[in-house]
Amino acid sequence: MPKYKYNKINILFSCCLLVSFVVAPLVVQAQEDPLVTQAREAAKEAKPLVQELLHLKNQQQFEKVEQNFEKAQRFLEDNRPNQEQIVEQLKSAKDVQTITKITIDFGGEEIFLDFDEVTKHYLNQPLSAKTVFALTKELTQVLYNAGYVTSAIGLKSSKIKNGEVEFVVLWGKVNDILVEEQQASLFKDKAMLFVLPNLKGKVLRIYDVDQLIEILNTGNKTAKVNVIAANEKSMSNLSIERHRTSYPQVSLSLNNSGEGSNAEGRNQATLSISWSDLLGTNDRWSFSTGYRIYKDRQANRQQNYSLSYTQPFSFSTLDIKLSYSGYKKQLRGIHTHGSSGETKQASFKLSHTLLRNKDMILSLYGELEFKRRLSYFGDIRIGKYHNNKLNIGLSYVTNLGHGKLYSDLSYSNGLRWFNANHSAYNSHRDKTLRLVSGSINWQRPFVFFNRGMSYQFRLGAQYGFDSLYGENQFSIGDEYTVRGFKGGAGSGDRGFYISQTVTIPFYPQKSYLSYINPFLGIDIGKVHAKRPHHVVDTFAGFAFGVKAQIKSLALSLTYAKPINGVGTFEESNKKSVFYFTGSVSF
C-alpha cells in the first residue's frame, strides 16, 4: 500500500481509538474538541525523532568537513617550491652549438610526468656543461614535485651528437617495509603491515608514504615513517616508528541543542568513546550515545546510540556503522496518551583514494544504508517504515586561493531490496528516492591590522527529484547550517545554505589555556517542499561567540539571532538563541 495512504489510515485509526477515550467527557465538555487536537498530535508523533535524526546528520557533515580540513593542513603543501629558472642567463652564452632535441627514457616504467614545461625552454639554447647542468636540475625538480624523492635523472650518454640531449630516469624503489628498522615479529606489527599498501618493489613516491602515515596514525597509535637506504642499489627501506597506548579516549559533553525549554528536553548529555588498534590492523572503533534531559523522565525520553568500525585496506577504507534512535512523548488533551518510536540504521561505506599528491586528494566512495522505523500510539503500532538507499560520491581536498578547499558531491538512489518501502512520492504515486547533494567548504588564513584571522565559507545543497519522506529531507536552522534557529526551522525536498565565519584566534601560551577564539558569522538558507503543501522558506541569521580550550575542557558559546525581513517564519523562530557545548576529554 502506498505510504501516504498508509499514513492517512494511521490517523483515521488513531482517531477511532481516541473516540473510546473522549466520548464520555465530550458529553459534559462539549465546548472542547479534544479529538481533533489529539489526532493532530498523533499525526505529528514522529516529529521529535525526525528532528533529532536531521540534526545528527547535519552534525556528522560538519564534523566530516572539519576532519578533511585537518587532513588538508597535514598533508597538502601551502606553496609550490620555487624552481630556479636560469634560461635567461644562458641566452648570453656564446657557444655555437645549440640544443636541438631533448629525450627522456623512463626506464620501462609506465609513469607519466610532464617534462615539456621545462624542456621547451631549453630548445635552441646554447649547448654547454652549464646548460646541461641547469636542465638536469630542473628535470630533477619535476621528479621531486611529483613525489619521487629517491629517484634521479641523468644523461643517458656523455656523448651528445647533433645537439640531441638524452636523459634517463633512475628510479628509486621500495625494498621492504620494516618496523624499527627490523622485520616485524610481533603479531600486531605483522597485522599492521598486512593492511598497508603493497609498495615492495615499486617506485617510491612520497605521497604513497603519506597514505601510510594517515593509515598508521590512529587514536591509540602514533607513527612516523623513515626512508632509509637499503643495501641494494637504488633501493630504500621504509622503517616505521610506532608508539601504542592501551586506554580508550573518552569524551563527556553537554549541549543545549533542543528547541524546547529545559523541562522539555533542551539539554542533551553525550558520551563518546574511541578506541583503535584493538586488532592491530590500524582499525578504529567508536561508540557514542546522546540522552535528552526531561523534567518528567518517565513520560518523555529521547536517546540515540551509535557504534562504528573503520578498517583501512591499502588505498581503500571500509566504514561500518550501526545506530539506534528512540523517543517517548506524552500527548496531552482531556486524556493523556503516549506516543513512541524508534529508528534502527546500518550503513556500509567503501571509499578509495583515486589520486593523491602535494596539492590534492581525490576519493570515490559508495555506501549502502538500511533503515527501519517503527511508530506507536500507546501500545498500538501505527507505522512501520523500511528504507534502503545507495549513495555514490566523490570527495576532493585541495589547495585553493592560499587556503584549503574540501568539496563533495553524491547521488542517492532508493532501493526496494527486502520489500523496502518507497522513500519519495509525487501527486500520482509513491516513488523511489533520487537526490543529488553536495557541499563546498573553503578555509583560509589572512591578516587584518597585523592580526592573524581565519575565514571559513560553507555551502551545502540538496536537490530531490520528487517529494521526500522524513529524514531524507534537507534541513536547515541549527548551529551547523543557518544559525539563529533550533530544531530544524525548515526542511524540504531541495534547498541550500551558505554559512560564513571569521575567527580571530588567540594563543595565550598559558599552561591552563590552549586557545581562545572569538568568531562572527552570517548565514542564509532556503528550502523548498512541494508536498503535502507547496512551501518555500528562506532563513537568515547572524552569530557571534567564542570557543576555548582549557586543558582537557573544551567550551563553545554562541549567541545567534534571525535576521528580520528575510523570509517568513513562525513567531517562535524570531527570538534569539544561545548554543552551548561543553566537553571534557580524557
Swiss-Prot record:
PROSITE patterns: POTRA. Gene3D superfamilies: membrane protein fhac, membrane protein fhac: a member of the omp85/tpsb transporter family. GO terms for biological process: monoatomic ion transport; protein secretion by the type V secretion system. One of its GO terms (cellular component) is type V protein secretion system complex. It is found in: Cell outer membrane. Residues 1-30 form the signal peptide. GO terms for molecular function: porin activity; protein transmembrane transporter activity. It comes from the Bacteria. Keywords: Cell outer membrane, Ion transport, Membrane, Porin, Protein transport, Signal, Transmembrane, Transmembrane beta strand, Transport. InterPro entries: Hemolysn_activator_HlyB_C, Polypept-transport_assoc_ShlB, POTRA, TPS, TPS_OM_transporter. Residues 97-172 form the POTRA domain. Belongs to the TPS (TC 1.B.20) family. Possible member (with IbpA) of a two partner secretion pathway (TPS) in which it would mediate the secretion of protein IbpA (high molecular weight immunoglobulin-binding protein). PANTHER family: OUTER MEMBRANE TRANSPORTER CDIB, SLR1661 PROTEIN. Probably a beta-barrel protein. This is Outer membrane transporter protein IbpB. The gene is ibpB.
